[in-house]
Curated annotation (Swiss-Prot):
It comes from Rhizobium rhizogenes. Residues 230-242, 378-388, 649-661, 668-678 have a biased composition (Basic and acidic residues). It comes from the Bacteria. This is Protein VirD3. The keyword ATP-binding does not apply. The keyword Endoplasmic reticulum does not apply.
Amino acid sequence: MANEEFTGHFARPAPVANDEGRRTTSTSIPAHAMAAREDGRDTSVAVTLSRPPNSGIPHGIPETSASGRRLVAAHPQDAAMPLGLSETRTDLPAILRKNNGDFRTAMQHWRELLHENPDKRDREASALPDLGARGIKRPREIEHPGDANRSVTRREIGLGREIDTVAASSLVNRDTWVAHSSNGQGGPQAGVYNVQPSADRAQETSQESSTLPDPTSVSALYSGPPSEWVGRDTGYETDRNSGDTISAPIRGLEELEDSADSRYFGHEAQSLSANVTTSISNAEASSHSEHTEILDDVSSARSGEQGRGGDGGAILGFSHDLSPHPQRLPQTTPDDFPELTNAAMAEIDAIFESLSQKSLARESAAPVLHEPVSGDAFQKEGTSDRADGMPSNGEPPVEQAGGHLPQALRSSGAELDDFSWLTDAALAEIDALIKSHSNRSSSVRNAAPDLRGAGLDNAVGKDSVIEHAEKISIDSPRPARLNGERSPKAQKSSQASLADFPDLTDAEWAHIEETERIAITAIEKGKQKISTKADTRSGFGNSSVPQVGNRSGAPMVPNTNQPIPSWYHKAENISNGLVEDTHITPAVVSSRRRNDAENASTRFGDPAPALRHYNLGRTLEATPVRDVISGTSRDRGLTAHAADQLAIDDSRKRTDRDRKTQPYIRGLDSRSREGYGR
């Protein structure tokens, strides 16, 4: 042991532990070390076995696929030998013929020895060229320096597999750990191998280089949350499972273009600017990767083709801060319509200008009617004051002389030049028609009694529309008071005269006056017999309800100057019948029928029906007004009424039993009635 030398195959005592106890086992392991850092610490240790590389697969490296590639730890106890290699080998070293725990312990002890003796790495590295002299095939190794804290060596071993070894003593970059954690893989650990079939990596190996470009800002199209992109390791690894990592040094140009297309045109496409920073040596800091430039060109070209309108102007663009620029609509130019002549274009422009002016004129001339005016809620004059000269009755503004008003021209947007094809005679005829139509509509509207205005005037008072009919005279079609004096409002709102209706004859005027007189008389009679004021009275659980009563008053005497036709008396009789039909007159019935009705109402919980006489002599049953109660008060009233009726019936029964009166004989037959009271 003391005379051992560092050769291509050297033996190092390694204390191992097994079931039999502690002992020392010699293992033959070829090794080499990478260049040391400036502070003297080693950055990586590449490990291979002493057996030929094509003879088998080391322990702890399971089979993986291209789609489900993952990082696995090189623990021999968790792996099984591939098919065809499970038979017993006699040429294996002694450490490989032992159990898996001995091999793991020996490897750990060997790494500790290398860490304690950094001065021997040069001697170990110098022994590497002797491998070719001894006839041993050296594994194909490609160094991929990562950041300042780690270095990765890719080695090709037997059966078409590659091993990416991370140094045991190297510090893992925090960004790389975050990126692996976001993918659910966990951070890279010491002694962890990334194994994938070399056939799947053949295309990527031809594209990759031994170094990465200088730290630069790469504009990459990426679909997904930004947290999955920031801190992702883009040095040499590509996660094919998720498809989210875009590594420019490894992926081909065709794959980059396809990725840019699929990610830009998707619904989740986002244009992000990710700063992909990689650490390289000072000698390679000045070099710039052409893949980065091509990636930027492809991204900008794809986004530019889809973000342009018909005229070549950009429609939508995204900056690196994810804030969209304002959208600019395309503008039409004369070049877009080569079939149109200059005259046609000028005509189109003139039409567009006229339409624009008309729309602006309508907006400026429209009256503001939606503004709330608290003081004019019941005033009809307030609307005309706010309508900019527009009359309150909605008449079109027409000049007295028959000409057009300037305000009407402004409100409609029409001018005389717009109707150059109309002659003076046609314009005069139009003015005459407008004037006659306005006069006719105003005459008909003013001739009718303004009952709607009466309702507005008395909206907050006690008088009703019926009482307002006092202002309408009998012998005049215009509203007036009973004494013949016209009210100011009636004079203002009604200005009809015989001259307004030249087509009506005297007979038609007389018929209209008689009809109006009949209507007013019926209204007055109904007002005398029907009171609008509510009277209250108490009953069995009944609340205050309006009662119907007669109000004394002298009937209105018709005008004696006008003859009263015979059909007027018929109409008066019909009106009196309708008014009298509203009064309920209880009928006089026997005590037996009244008791039966009360008992039925008590039994079924319904109000007791009352009897009344119709004006034609028929006796009908009707429900009194006092018993029509709604809601909870009705139920309480019925309950109280039933309790009172039960108490009254019990009192009557006791009185009849004591006095032995006649009502008890009703339920007895003739035989029992003979001996009753003896």
